[in-house]
Swiss-Prot record:
Subcellular location, record wording: Cell membrane; Apical cell membrane
Extracellular topological domain residue ranges: 1-68, 123-139, 188-231, 368-376, 433-445, 505-528
Ranges that cross the membrane: 69-89, 102-122, 140-160, 167-187, 232-252, 347-367, 377-397, 412-432, 446-466, 482-504
Molecular function GO terms recorded: efflux transmembrane transporter activity; monoamine transmembrane transporter activity; monoatomic cation transmembrane transporter activity; neurotransmitter transmembrane transporter activity; nucleoside transmembrane transporter activity; organic acid transmembrane transporter activity; organic cation transmembrane transporter activity; toxin transmembrane transporter activity
Organism: Mus musculus
Biological-process GO terms, alphabetical: adenosine transport; cellular detoxification; dopamine transport; dopamine uptake; epinephrine transport; epinephrine uptake; export across plasma membrane; histamine transport
UniProt-annotated glycosylation sites, renumbered to this chain: N521
Listed name of the protein: Equilibrative nucleoside transporter 4
Amino acid sequence: MGSIGSQRLKEPCVAATSDQSVVTSFSFDNFQLETTAEGAQDPGIRVRGVPTFTDSAVEEPVPDDRYHAIYFAMLLAGVGFLLPYNSFITDVDYLHHKYPGTSIVFDMSLTYILVALAAVLLNNVVVERLNLHTRITTGYLLALGPLLFISICDVWLQLFSHDQAYAINLAAVGTVAFGCTVQQSSFYGYTGLLPKRYTQGVMTGESTAGVMISLSRILTKLLLPDERASTIIFFLVSAGLELLCFLLHLLVRRSRFVLYYTTRPRDSRPVQAGYRVHHDVASGDIHFEHQTPALSSSRSPKESPAHEVTHSNSGVYMRFDVPRPRVKRSWPTFRALLLHRYVVARVIWADMLSIAVTYFITLCLFPGLESEIRHCVLGEWLPILVMAVFNLSDFVGKILAALPVEWRGTHLLACSCLRVVFIPLFILCVYPSGMPALRHPAWPCVFSLLMGISNGYFGSVPMILAAGKVSPKQRELAGNTMTVSYMSGLTLGSAVAYCTYSLTRDAHGSCFQTATAAAANDSIPVGP
């Protein structure tokens, strides 16, 4: 019986024999049984009641991403959690016209980063407690609401006074920051469960959001001379794109491909096919029942006891199977939360520092300092063009991050630190105020191009590599931990950028002062 049934039986009480003795109890060390037909030369030779069979596919085959639909959905996911913020800061011409002489772009950037840092820390705490898709859905709703509210109530209907509108815009940016950051942090944990290319897809989507928003603003400004009308259309287009990303997420999360990767790491062990032994006490017949993984996992503990006696028309059956461990879900303690994060951080510390330094340097300059670059001929078009160049080159950099290059964490960190050279170069484009050292508009465009490519590449590669350095069960936590580092760099960079506002305070009136001085010189009478 033992050689035919399981790989190894333990503690048998009475063995079933050819003289119709009854097996009363036994237990298994393993679910899977060897095929009984392997040792039989004649198909008719078998123990009474035991059928010959072969095991079917034990593990579910890996599903394909047909037509790269899942990759495209993840790219749009990246669009979704940066598109709202980009919408607020890219209409820089409207902001300068409505709030002249204020630091509105700097205030929006700092508000976004401070709220985003708090949101990513909160999300990192509740990552084991709240459902992944609950967090993502909440993020989408918090991002869509302010976009629609500002476009309708402030830009279109103009229901608020100047000071009220200023405060409401900052509050809207803060709400967007909270929702989008929870969404972003959750998506990095989400894609950490998928193959590496999907993390790269999400990060490419972030840059795609910047490109799409920049093109949208340029087109609406060109096609609609009325600044207010173009801004309304601009915000409504952004809200429509955000809604599209949300609906696509709801479809993709139920796909077979995503479910295959996101459900496996949560199990304590892989769910494999098993067998149940049925022994007919009356007739002595014994047969094996094959259980598929889906069937095994769908049964409740009451439906799958270790030892059950059932009655049927053919007699009494005694069923023997292996009890599955009952896992009691409990919230981890604060000490356990810290320990989990410490274990992950020890493995990916270089990647954490690399992404933090990369975004620290970028946020020192973008969008704050870049939005204040002025030119007497191009006017408000120059900051729009400079930001568009950055978004486009950042998009290219994140595509380059998909190249199969093996990086050591320390090398990535060193290259990220070299980007500090962009800070003095951009300062020379705005300082001295009114007559900067690098006045030609080509300079900020070239610097923005190089900074965007390097930001896209060195901001993506650490995030892509980090998830592969930890076990599958730790990948969601690794993605969230990397997002904490990412947001820390953004916060410090925004704080430094806010301090540079004084360098550009007089830039708005520089062209007017130059024109006035030129007119005064022309009016001075010239002697004979």
